[in-house]
């Protein structure tokens, strides 16, 4: 007689950390893997109740802190009314129109048409398409050490070959110039559809351009009929010390890129231009650019509430004062250099080992 023995394997329950490491797509071989369960104001709390001061802010997303009641109430109300109904640009949706009106009321008159996206990199992609469509040119100029997102088009203009090389071939006809270089502006010609620049280079380590260089860039673009696209996805919404960083340079871009803090903690991006430029998407072909979740009603409601709070509480007016406080207290022989603009900070250490020690101590 043959006996059949059934072997039952009992799976051991995985911890959240194990699920994170095994079932969430990773972006680095050694993630922080902190298990955050709550956030309030400028504080984060892990599963063990340990408190952290959040100096990252979701990478410039949470400009008014975590758990803002005005934002939460706006999200709840809009979720009760309706969430997703149609791609943006086809139906009249109050959350979109109300937020677009608030944004354009606080921008120069030529930045009057808002195309909402679901993220910052999508805003970059949209601006690249719009520039090519409006000018009927193909060349796009960007800057070395820049960062505009990691989708295919945004990656093509990203200013560091280390990040680009593994994903080639990328978009053709991309020109990379040196940031803050007057001589390189001569490379912008009547074949250039647009120049895309961060108003303040963030990922490069808070590189602040000279006022005269920014004005020369604006002048060169005007002379050649090239659209100037300024990326304020990270430095916008007051983090730089003013609501929009470009106002510190006495210039106005043809297209403005927004994201991160735009959604008040919810996923939202936008590119903003004059209506005569934006209307290039309406024909030849129609639906020249569409986006299923761009301008999601709940995200627009959250973003509008966050921007209103930012303005009503006059938070931006305190940014430079807070910058001085940080600069006064950031004192160590290990810090080789500090670069800042408003509440954007970059600290340079002598080597990676010193940098890692600081990170480990903070965690």
Name each region found by the language model:
Residues 1-2, 14:
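Accessible peptide chain termini
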Residues 3-9:
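Short, low-complexity, charge-dense intrinsically disordered segments
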Residues 14-363:
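Conserved N-terminal phosphate-binding loop of PLP-dependent enzymes in the Aspartate aminotransferase
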């Amino acid at each position: 007689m043959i006996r059949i023995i059934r072997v039952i394997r009992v799976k051991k329950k995985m911890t959240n950390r194990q699920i994170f490491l095994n079932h969430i797509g990773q972006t680095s071989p050694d993630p922080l893997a902190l298990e955050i369960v709550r956030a309030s104001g400028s504080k984060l709390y892990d599963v063990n109740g340990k408190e952290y001061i959040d100096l990252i802010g979701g990478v410039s997303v949470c400009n008014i802190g975590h758990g803002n009641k005005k934002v939460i109430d706006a999200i709840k109300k809009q979720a009760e009314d309706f969430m997703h109904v149609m791609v943006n640009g086809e139906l009249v949706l109050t959350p979109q129109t109300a937020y677009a009106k608030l944004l354009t009321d606080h921008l120069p008159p030529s930045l009057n048409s808002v195309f909402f996206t679901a993220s910052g990199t999508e805003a970059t992609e949209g601006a690249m398409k719009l520039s090519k469509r409006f000018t009927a040119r193909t060349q796009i100029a960007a800057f070395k050490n820049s960062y505009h997102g990691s989708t295919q088009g945004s990656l093509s203009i990203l200013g560091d070959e280390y990040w680009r090389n593994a994903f080639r071939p990328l978009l053709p006809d991309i020109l990379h110039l040196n940031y803050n270089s007057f001589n390189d502006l001569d490379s912008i010609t009547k074949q250039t559809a647009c120049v895309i620049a961060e108003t303040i280079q963030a990922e490069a380590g808070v590189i602040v351009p000279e006022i005269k260089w920014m004005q020369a860039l604006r002048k060169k673009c005007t002379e050649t009929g090239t659209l100037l696209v300024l990326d304020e996805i990270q430095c916008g919404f007051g983090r730089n010390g003013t609501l929009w960083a470009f106002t510190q340079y006495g210039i106005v871009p043809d297209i403005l890129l927004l994201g991160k803090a735009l959604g008040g903690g919810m996923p939202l991006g936008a590119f903003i231009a004059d209506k005569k430029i934006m209307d290039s998407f309406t024909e030849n072909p129609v639906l020249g650019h569409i986006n299923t979740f761009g301008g999601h009603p709940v995200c627009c409601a959250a973003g509008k509430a966050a921007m209103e709070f930012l303005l009503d509480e006059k938070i931006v007016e305190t940014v430079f004062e807070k910058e001085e406080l940080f600069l006064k207290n950031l004192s160590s022989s290990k810090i080789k250099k500090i670069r800042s603009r408003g509440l954007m900070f970059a600290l340079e250490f002598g080597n990676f080992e010193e940098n890692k020690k600081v990170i480990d101590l903070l965690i």
